[in-house]
């Protein structure tokens, strides 16, 4: 199947499952899920496969490994809703655990879409390397950030930050936020 975009029916399914979040409703609408949600997401993964392979030839591209499951694990949560009202795709190096690995992601929800690159959870080793680079070569770090065109494309740098991390005196003000990032 060729990816032609996400149909309006994808978002409509997410809205419907939000308000009818039970197993009986899902089973009655499983065909809609397969057609309007799962098939477009799988086509999206296949469409992006060549680009992902050009970044890393060992990128995980099997749809069942890249696509989030609609069914939630509710064992340890107060919210026992069995289904998500959004889905995401993660592209990461095959065989790596999700936690701490570098990945590209895309999320579609009724409220909109998000996409980006980063890590899932903390990757202390990578962040320590970034901090050392900020101290040693702040202009080089600024140049890399500039080449990413973050501000021109309205992209945000997100993630949690250390609240009490001591930032060395030589770190420029515009890089202090980057230095304090946890992830």
Feature annotation, model-predicted:
Residues 1-10:
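Acidic, low-complexity proline/glycine-rich segments
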Residues 11-14, 30, 49, 86-88, ...:
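Short, well-ordered alpha-helical packing segments
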Residues 15-70:
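Active-site acidic/histidine clusters and adjacent loop/turn architecture
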Residues 55-57, 63, 69-93, 99, ...:
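Soluble extramembrane domains of integral membrane proteins
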Residues 70, 88, 163-176:
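Aromatic/basic-lined ligand-recognition segments
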Residues 75-137:
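Aromatic- and glycine-enriched beta-alpha-beta binding-site module
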Residues 110-170:
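Compact, glycine/acidic-enriched structural inserts
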Residues 178-183:
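Short, intrinsically disordered, charge-balanced linker/junction segments flanking boundaries
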């Amino acid at each position: 199947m060729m990816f032609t975009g996400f149909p309006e029916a994808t978002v409509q399914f997410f809205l419907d499952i939000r308000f009818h979040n039970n197993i009986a409703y899902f089973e009655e609408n499983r065909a809609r899920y397969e057609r309007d949600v799962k098939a477009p997401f799988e086509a999206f993964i296949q469409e992006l496969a060549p680009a992902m392979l050009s970044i890393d030839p060992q990128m995980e591209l099997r749809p069942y490994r890249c696509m989030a499951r609609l069914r939630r694990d509710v064992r340890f949560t107060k919210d026992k809703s069995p289904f998500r009202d959004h889905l995401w795709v993660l592209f990461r190096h095959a065989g790596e655990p999700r936690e701490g690995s570098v990945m590209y992601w895309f999320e579609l929800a009724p409220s909109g879409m998000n996409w980006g690159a980063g890590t899932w959870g903390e990757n202390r080793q990578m962040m320590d390397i970034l901090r050392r680079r900020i101290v040693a070569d702040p202009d080089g770090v600024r140049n890399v950030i500039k080449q990413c065109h973050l501000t021109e494309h309205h992209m945000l740098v997100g993630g949690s930050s250390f609240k009490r991390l001591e930032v060395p005196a030589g770190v420029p003000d515009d890089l202090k936020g980057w230095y304090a990032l946890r992830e």
